[in-house]
Amino acid sequence: MARIGLGVILNLAKEREPVELARSVAGILEHMFKHSEETCQRLVAAGGLDAVLYWCRRTDPALLRHCALALGNCALHGGQAAQRRMVEKRAAEWLFPLAFSKEDELLRLHACLAVAVLATNKEVEREVERSGTLALVEPLVASLDPGRFARCLVDASDTSQGRGPDDLQRLVPLLDSSRLEAQCIGAFYLCAEAAIKSLQGKTKVGVG
């Protein structure tokens, strides 16, 4: 499915307007970035990442949230090669205004997750640190309550089911990172995920 639809989506991604189309394509890219490492790297090489980074300059809340989630998925699922390309294309800098948003806590946290994951790559850690975005992670996490955040996720149509088992497994290594930012945001997401499952009456979080 991803292989068949890749060309179509990338052609649509070249159409940067109108915002309604951008919102839809960004949402599709958000999910395609976590299809597989190969798909993620092909998307990066063929312009999918460029489109997402371009849309980061927009002001539409739904579009920006898709962008933050897409960048987080790219960092989580694309491997070190994709992470290096993200940093070369200044993804950490583009994440700064998203992580600094005063109006959307979900947007801020998704952006902070993306930059924290990038910082776990030792090859690009210093470059990510210089962007200034990483410094926003700990204060944000300290200001949020996982239970309340879980309810926000459940109320949001695109995150109402929480993260799948594969996503959660990819968050676990953050807990062992030498970066405190990665540790705290990884722990926060896993706590929020447990709260989501509790709200849904499920007993298994999916990490094991």
Where do the protein language model's features map onto the residues?
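Short, hydrophobic/charged alpha-helical patches characteristic of ARM/HEAT alpha-solenoid repeats
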Residues: 1-4, 16-21, 38-46, 62-63, ...
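A signal for specific C-terminal beta-sheet/loop modules enriched in small/flexible residues
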Residues: 31, 144-145
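WD40 beta-propeller repeat blades
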Residues: 45, 100, 110, 120, ...
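Helix N-cap and loop-to-helix transition residues
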Residues: 18, 36, 60, 104, ...
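Short intrinsically disordered, low-complexity segments
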Residues: 85-86, 95, 123, 137
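Alpha-helical solenoid repeat architecture
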Residues: 8-13, 23-37, 51-54, 65-79, ...
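HEAT/HEAT-like alpha-solenoid repeats
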Residues: 7-17, 50-57, 93-103, 135-142, ...
